[in-house]
Curated annotation (Swiss-Prot):
Its EC number is 7.1.1.2. Keywords: Electron transport, Membrane, Mitochondrion, NAD, Respiratory chain, Translocase, Transmembrane, Transmembrane helix, Transport, Ubiquinone. InterPro entries: ComplexI_Subunit6, NADH_UbQ/plastoQ_OxRdtase_su6, Nuo/plastoQ_OxRdtase_6_NuoJ. One of its GO terms (molecular function) is NADH dehydrogenase (ubiquinone) activity. This is NADH-ubiquinone oxidoreductase chain 6. Core subunit of the mitochondrial membrane respiratory chain NADH dehydrogenase (Complex I) that is believed to belong to the minimal assembly required for catalysis. Complex I functions in the transfer of electrons from NADH to the respiratory chain. The immediate electron acceptor for the enzyme is believed to be ubiquinone. PANTHER family: NADH UBIQUINONE OXIDOREDUCTASE SUBUNIT ND6, NADH-UBIQUINONE OXIDOREDUCTASE CHAIN 6. The keyword Translocase applies. Disulfide bonds: none annotated. Belongs to the complex I subunit 6 family. It is an enzyme of class 7 (translocase). The chain crosses the membrane at residues 1-21, 28-48, 53-73, 87-107, 139-159. It comes from Scyliorhinus canicula (Small-spotted catshark).
Length: 173
């Protein structure tokens, strides 16, 4: 199980690197799907099955719509691939920053425990995952409403930007 979780963590870093290097919107969308899938798989391996399902649906439902509009706006006949030198430079900068931040911030703090939600010392009647969902809807209800409004405003902004060549924001000058 440790090997499986380690491979999923490496996959999460590679997916986030694909989003951060962003050679083309097509590859950034692929990196986002990879990062969302592997990140939710990590949550499942630590015992958070319901929250991982909700996060996966939010990522794929909300963010990929924005990436679809971005890909439609920035349609390139010859997009940059991950093997180009400029993209490899961004990947190198991202990995260097990740290693430096990991050595500086994470020295001895979280590396000692791989315990999941169900491996805690206390005996609980309700799983930790469902307790978190209850807190999300009770104390975090205002954050859900705020997130819904932000997604709605984002949708209207994207629709306004892509409305038309003569009326929208992206018109030929």
């Amino acid at each position: 199980m440790v090997y499986f979780v380690s491979m999923m963590m490496i996959g999460l870093i590679l997916g986030l690197m694909g989003v951060a290097s962003n050679p083309s919107p097509y590859y950034a969308a692929l990196g986002l799907v990879t990062a969302a899938g592997v990140g939710c798989g990590l949550l499942v391996s630590y015992g958070g099955s319901f929250m991982s399902l909700i996060l996966f649906l939010i990522y794929l439902g909300g963010m990929l719509v924005v990436f679809a509009y971005t890909a439609a706006l920035a349609a390139e006949p010859y997009p940059e691939a991950w093997g180009d030198w400029s993209v490899l430079m961004y990947v190198g900068i991202y990995l260097t920053g990740l290693v430096i931040a990991g050595k500086y911030f994470l020295v001895g703090k979280w590396g000692d425990s791989w315990a999941g939600v169900e491996e805690l010392s206390s005996f609980e009647v309700v799983r930790g995952d469902f307790g978190g969902v209850a807190l999300l809807y009770s104390l975090g209800g205002w954050m859900l409403v705020l997130s819904g409004w932000v997604l709605l405003v984002t949708l209207f902004v994207v629709l306004e930007v892509t409305r038309g060549l003569s009326w929208g924001t992206l018109r030929a000058v």
